[in-house]
Amino acid sequence: LNTFHFNSLAILLMAGISCHTTADSYGIFDARSLALGGTGVALGNVDTGHFYNPALTAFHQGHEDRTRDGSHSFHAVLSALSDGARTAADAIADDLEGRLSAAIDDLNEVPTPGAARTGINAARDLENAMRQLDGKDVNADGYLGYSISLPGDMEGGAFFVGSRFIGRGVSDIDNADFDLLQDYVEALEFVESGGTAGEEHPELRDDAGRFIDPSFRIQSSAAGTGLLLSELGVSAAKQYNLWGQDVAVGIAPKVVHLRVFDEDWRVVDGEFASIGDNRTEFYFNVDLGTAVTLADHWRVALAVKDLRSKTITTDIGDRIELQPRSRLGLAYISESLDVGLDAELDKTPDLQGTAARQDISLGTEYRLSTLALRLGFRHDLEGSVGDQFSAGLGWRFSHLLMDFSYIQGDGGEGVGLRLGWAY
């Protein structure tokens, strides 16, 4: 039997963006910001602030050789994984179609009641998984990278390299496939019972009397696009005193390698085939940011991510647009307690221009001697995604730095991890 079809469909749904996708977001690139609901434009610190506002690394006093505030950090963040994506991942891990294929092969070799029962169970499990996927949004957004923070005396910078993956989709399961699997269940029940239950369904057998591969008749399909954004860059920031206030400006030039997966998966002559293309683009982009500290504890910040827009038209006619995203941040920062609010200034259209998103994020952090406690909330003003609540811990022991976070909301969840070394 052809075991490629359903697993490939599930994999595509894990990595696809269909015509009904939700909008692209500003992005979450580290575990601390994930725990704070995505807040970071004003509330970011010298370790990871460059991801959200390159000006933030300038808010530091003393050279890193004396303060030991610089760090090497490895980041692994899955900021969004929908329930549909979990269902697809479980289906891939369980290899449901492979189980059905093996059961049918065994039955064709030795047609015993036990082999028929194994095939019945496999067909029902596959049907249940397809029903769970039918019409569900399948969304995933994650980041994997490495960074070095270089805080100086009223100035700073960072080096960063990493990849962000964005994938969204909606399955298109044909109802005829459910009928097909039910026919196989009835035919296998007929074999198991010796003809006293089920139905014979001779149309499911070839001229030699062997069961035909059901994958040749499956009609379900999926079409979509996935993005892999890989960046290598540096950030630089400088702090100035203007009219008695500390003002910082920063810039983060970067080289971007963009890979677009644009495919249309469907059955062609009995095989699950892809009609589409994978494209790559290599270009330069830049992030800009500024921040000002007021009355010692208040900070107002503005940042623009990916100043240069990018438009790609794929071979199957989809127009993908990556536009600049701007955010305003407000934070209260003290010795032990930080509270921050981020708001996107514009609606951000999705990659195919069919929906929009505009996030506001609220986060708070309370620091003890070696432990940081974090809570966050994220809301989309356009309603394209549901509200999310998050929490996390930060821990420092000597030079070792660790951050853990978890986020959950309407229809999905995410996790984040950072491992760092202070120097």
Spans of model-derived segments:
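Short acidic/polar capping segments at secondary-structure boundaries
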Residues: 164, 241, 253-260, 295, ...
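Extracellular/periplasm-exposed beta-strand and loop segments of Gram-negative cell-envelope proteins
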Residues: 89, 122-138, 167-227, 256-284, ...
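Transmembrane beta-barrel domains of outer membrane proteins
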Residues: 55-58, 145-151, 160, 233-239, ...
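Transmembrane beta-barrel architecture of outer-membrane proteins
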Residues: 31, 139-143, 229-233, 281-285, ...
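Outer membrane beta-barrel transmembrane domains
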Residues: 291, 297-423
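N-terminal, post-signal peptide beta-strand-biased segments of exported outer-membrane/organellar beta-barrel
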Residues: 19-172, 421-423
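Short loop/turn motifs that connect adjacent beta-strands in outer-membrane beta-barrel proteins
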Residues: 58-72, 148-156, 239-248, 260, ...
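Cleavable N-terminal export/targeting peptides
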Residues: 1-30, 107, 112-116, 191, ...
